C-alpha cells in the first residue's frame, strides 16, 4: 500500500489509554484484583437499555439489546462478591486507585477536579452485570509536551468482565476482572501520523509503568483510537493490545475512510440516489436454483434447513468489490461484517467476487434472471434461517444506503493484521447518568500530598541517573525509549551492582536486536525470560557473555525450555577453564613466541570460541595473560 499524504488527507488521531492499576482490591469492593480460573457458580442475565439523564436511549445500547443475547457469568471464589453480581451496592471508591490516578494527572500537568462524581456509563454488551460501567473524571486538560499532544481528560473506572466464550445467542464472562481499577487517559485529536500515534501511546504507557503502581502483562493495558480524515467522521477503534499494531491500524483506517468517500463520489457520479436504490432493491428466495450446487457453504446451509436469498443491488456492479484496503478488505466485507454482527449470519457472497466458492457462472446467470437484474446491477447471495435472512436483508439495505453518506459513525474492533471490523454504532451523549449509590469524594490536601509521592520521575532526570549508573548517553536514551523501561528499573533494583546496569540495559535493547538479526523469533522472549537470565548472572550460574548465544538458541529452536538452555551454558569450573587455556597455549607455542605480547588476542579468540559463552571474558583474559607471561619469557 502506497503511503498517503496524511497532511493533505487531514488525518486526526486521538488515543484513549486504559491501564489496570495494581491495587490490592477492586475499585468498589474488597475483592482481590488477581484473575482466577476456578468457579463454582454461574448466574444468567438478559440486559436491556435504560434512559440516560437526558431521558434518551443510547443508540449503541439499543443495538446490543436487539441482539437478544443471554449472558452467563462465572462467579470465581476469591475474586468476586455480591457487588460484582449487582446484588449489593458498591462500597466507597478505592483510595489507593485515586492516589495513583492523581499522581499520573500531576505528571501530565492536568487540572485536578475539586470533587469526584461517579457516573454510570450505559453498556449492555454483557461485560457488566449492571448494564453500566462506573467511571469518574479526576482531571481535565494537560499536555504531552514533547509531542504537542493535549490531554482531554483522565478518569478512573472499573474494568469489564472477562469474556470467556461467545456464541450466536449466548456470551460467557468471568467476574474476576470486573471491577479492577482502570485509569483512562484521553488525548485530544492532535496526532497527525501513524508513527506519532505509536510514539504517544508508548510514552503514556511508560509514564504509567514508571509509577510502579500498574499491572503488567497481556490484557492489562488497552489502547482505543479515534481516527478521522477531512470530509469524514470520527471512527472509534477498540481493543488494540499490541503497541506495534497502532501504525498499521491508523494507516489502514485512513485509507479505508478515503475509499469510502470515493465510493460515495462514484454513487453520485452514476446518478444514483438513496430513493432510486431503495425502489429498485429486489429480494427473492432462490433456494431452488441451488438444489444441486457444488458450493459447500450453500449446500451445508440448505441441508440444515436454511434458505438462499438473492438480492439485486441496483447499478452497484463493481462497488461491492471496491477495495477499501488493498488485498485485505472490500466494500462487500463491510456489508458482511454488518450482517454478521446484526443478523448472526456468515454466508454472504456478491457478484463482484463470483464465480467462486463453488458457485458457477450458470448459477449466477439463473439468479440474475430470477431477480430481473442487468449486468450493471450487483447480486448478493445469503444463506441461513428465514428469520435471520429477513433481518439480514434489512441490514444489507441499510448499509448500502449509508454508502451515500460516506463514512458511517461506527465503533470498530481491532484485528491482528491491523485492519478493523464493525462492532456497533457509536454511542452518543445519551449514555451517562449519575451513580446514586456512591457519594461525591472531595479532593483534600492529604490525598494530594499522598499522590505527589507517587509522581514518576521525568525522562531528563532519568537520563542523568542512568549515566551515573554507567550507561553511555546513547544506551541511556535507548532504554528510556524502550517499552521495557520499567523492567530495566526493576532488574537494576533487584540485581545491581553484582549485575552491572549496563549489562541489563544492553540485554533488553542491543542483545534482542542481535538475536533478531540471527533469525530469532524475539516474540518468544517475555519479561520473565529476561529476568531469568539476569538472575542467573547474579547467581554466577552463567556469564554475561553467554546471553546472546542462549537467546539465539532459544528463539531458533522448537519445544525447548529456556532453563534447559541456561543449564547448557552454565559457567565452567575454574579448573576446567584453566585446562582448556593450557591446551590451546600448548597447541600454539610457535605462533605465541613469534607474536609475543600480541598473541593474547589469538589465544583469547580461540578460548572464547571453545567455551562458547561459558566463561566470563575478564576472567579468561586474566588467566591467559598470566600464563602467556611465563611462555613468552
Swiss-Prot record:
Catalytically driven reaction(s): L-glutamyl-tRNA(Gln) + L-glutamine + ATP + H2O = L-glutaminyl-tRNA(Gln) + L-glutamate + ADP + phosphate + H(+)
Keyword Protein biosynthesis: yes
EC number(s) recorded for this UniProt protein: 6.3.5.-
Pfam families membership: GAD (PF02938), GatB_N (PF02934), GatB_Yqey (PF02637)
SUPFAM superfamilies membership: GAD domain-like, GatB/YqeY motif, Glutamine synthetase/guanido kinase
GO biological process terms on file: glutaminyl-tRNAGln biosynthesis via transamidation; translation
Keywords, comma-separated and alphabetical: ATP-binding, Ligase, Nucleotide-binding, Protein biosynthesis
GO molecular function: aminoacyl-tRNA ligase activity; ATP binding; glutaminyl-tRNA synthase (glutamine-hydrolyzing) activity
Coiled-coil regions listed in the entry: none
Region (Disordered): 415-437
Any one annotated GO CC term: cytoplasm
NCBIfam families, per database record: gatE_arch, PRK04028.1
UniProt-listed HAMAP family: GatE
Family classification: Belongs to the GatB/GatE family. GatE subfamily.
Quaternary structure note: Heterodimer of GatD and GatE.
Function of the protein: Allows the formation of correctly charged Gln-tRNA(Gln) through the transamidation of misacylated Glu-tRNA(Gln) in organisms which lack glutaminyl-tRNA synthetase. The reaction takes place in the presence of glutamine and ATP through an activated gamma-phospho-Glu-tRNA(Gln). The GatDE system is specific for glutamate and does not act on aspartate.
Protein name stated in the entry: Glutamyl-tRNA(Gln) amidotransferase subunit E
Lineage, broadest ranks: Archaea, Thermoproteota, Thermoprotei, Sulfolobales, Sulfolobaceae
Originating gene: gatE
Amino acid at each position: 500500500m502506497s503511503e498517503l499524504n496524511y497532511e493533505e488527507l487531514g488525518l486526526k488521531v486521538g488515543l484513549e489509554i486504559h491501564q489496570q492499576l495494581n491495587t490490592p482490591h477492586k475499585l468498589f469492593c474488597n475483592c482481590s484484583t488477581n484473575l482466577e480460573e476456578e468457579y463454582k457458580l454461574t448466574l444468567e442475565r438478559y440486559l436491556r437499555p435504560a434512559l440516560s439523564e437526558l431521558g434518551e436511549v443510547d443508540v449503541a445500547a439499543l443495538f446490543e439489546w436487539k441482539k437478544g443475547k443471554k449472558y452467563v457469568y462465572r462467579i470465581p471464589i476469591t475474586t468476586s462478591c455480591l457487588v460484582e453480581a449487582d446484588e449489593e451496592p458498591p462500597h466507597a471508591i478505592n483510595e489507593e486507585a485515586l492516589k495513583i490516578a492523581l499522581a499520573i494527572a500531576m505528571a501530565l500537568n492536568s487540572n485536578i477536579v475539586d470533587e469526584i462524581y461517579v457516573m454510570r456509563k450505559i453498556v449492555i454488551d454483557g461485560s457488566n452485570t449492571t448494564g453500566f460501567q462506573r467511571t469518574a473524571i479526576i482531571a481535565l486538560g494537560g499536555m504531552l509536551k514533547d509531542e504537542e499532544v493535549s490531554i482531554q481528560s483522565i478518569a478512573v473506572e472499573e474494568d469489564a468482565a472477562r469474556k470467556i466464550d461467545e456464541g450466536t445467542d449466548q456470551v460467557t464472562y468471568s467476574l474476576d476482572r470486573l471491577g479492577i481499577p482502570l485509569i483512562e487517559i484521553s488525548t485530544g485529536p492532535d496526532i497527525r501520523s501513524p508513527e506519532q500515534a505509536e510514539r504517544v501511546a508508548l510514552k503514556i504507557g511508560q509514564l504509567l509503568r514508571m509509577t510502579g503502581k500498574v499491572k503488567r502483562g497481556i490484557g492489562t493495558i488497552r489502547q482505543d483510537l479515534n481516527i478521522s480524515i477531512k470530509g469524514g467522521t470520527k471512527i472509534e477503534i477498540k481493543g488494540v493490545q499490541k503497541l506495534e499494531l497502532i501504525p498499521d491500524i491508523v494507516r489502514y483506517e485512513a485509507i479505508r475512510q478515503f475509499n469510502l468517500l470515493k465510493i460515495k463520489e462514484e454513487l453520485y457520479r452514476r446518478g444514483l440516489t438513496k430513493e432510486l436504490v431503495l425502489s429498485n432493491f429486489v429480494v427473492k428466495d432462490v433456494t431452488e436454483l441451488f438444489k444441486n450446487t457444488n458450493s459447500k457453504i450453500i449446500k451445508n446451509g440448505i441441508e440444515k434447513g436454511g434458505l438462499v436469498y438473492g438480492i439485486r443491488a441496483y447499478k452497484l456492479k463493481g462497488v461491492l468489490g471496491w477495495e477499501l484496503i488493498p488485498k485485505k478488505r472490500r466494500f462487500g466485507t463491510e456489508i458482511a461484517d454488518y450482517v454478521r454482527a446484526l443478523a448472526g449470519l456468515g454466508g454472504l457472497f456478491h457478484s463482484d467476487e463470483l464465480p467462486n466458492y463453488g458457485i458457477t457462472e450458470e448459477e449466477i446467470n439463473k439468479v440474475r434472471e430470477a431477480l430481473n437484474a442487468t449486468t450493471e446491477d450487483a447480486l448478493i447471495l445469503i444463506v441461513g434461517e428465514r428469520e435471520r435472512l429477513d433481518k439480514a436483508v434489512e441490514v444489507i439495505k441499510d448499509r448500502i444506503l449509508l454508502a451515500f453518506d460516506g463514512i458511517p459513525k461506527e465503533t470498530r474492533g481491532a484485528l491482528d493484521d491491523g485492519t478493523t471490523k464493525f462492532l456497533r454504532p457509536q454511542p452518543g451523549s445519551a449514555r451517562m447518568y449519575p451513580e446514586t449509590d456512591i457519594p461525591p469524594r472531595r479532593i483534600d490536601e492529604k490525598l494530594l500530598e499522598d499522590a505527589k509521592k507517587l509522581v514518576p520521575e521525568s525522562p531528563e532526570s532519568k537520563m542523568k541517573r542512568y549515566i551515573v549508573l554507567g550507561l553511555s548517553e546513547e544506551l541511556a536514551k535507548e532504554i528510556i525509549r524502550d517499552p521495557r523501561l520499567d523492567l530495566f528499573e526493576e532488574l537494576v533494583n533487584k540485581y545491581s551492582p553484582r549485575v552491572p546496569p549496563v549489562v541489563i540495559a544492553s540485554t533488553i535493547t542491543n542483545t534482542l536486536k542481535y538475536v533478531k538479526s540471527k533469525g530469532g523469533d524475539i516474540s518468544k522472549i517475555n519479561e520473565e525470560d529476561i529476568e531469568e537470565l539476569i538472575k542467573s548472572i547474579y547467581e554466577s550460574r552463567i556469564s554475561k557473555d553467554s546471553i546472546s548465544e542462549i537467546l539465539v538458541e532459544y528463539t531458533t529452536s522448537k519445544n525447548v525450555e529456556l532453563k534447559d538452555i541456561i543449564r547448557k551454558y552454565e559457567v565452567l569450573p575454574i579448573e576446567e577453564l584453566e585446562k582448556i587455556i593450557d591446551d590451546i597455549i600448548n597447541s600454539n607455542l610457535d605462533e605465541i613466541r613469534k607474536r609475543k605480547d600480541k598473541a593474547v588476542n589469538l589465544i583469547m579468540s580461540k578460548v572464547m570460541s571453545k567455551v562458547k559463552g561459558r566463561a566470563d571474558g575478564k576472567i579468561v583474559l586474566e588467566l591467559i595473560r598470566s600464563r602467556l607471561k611465563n611462555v613468552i619469557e
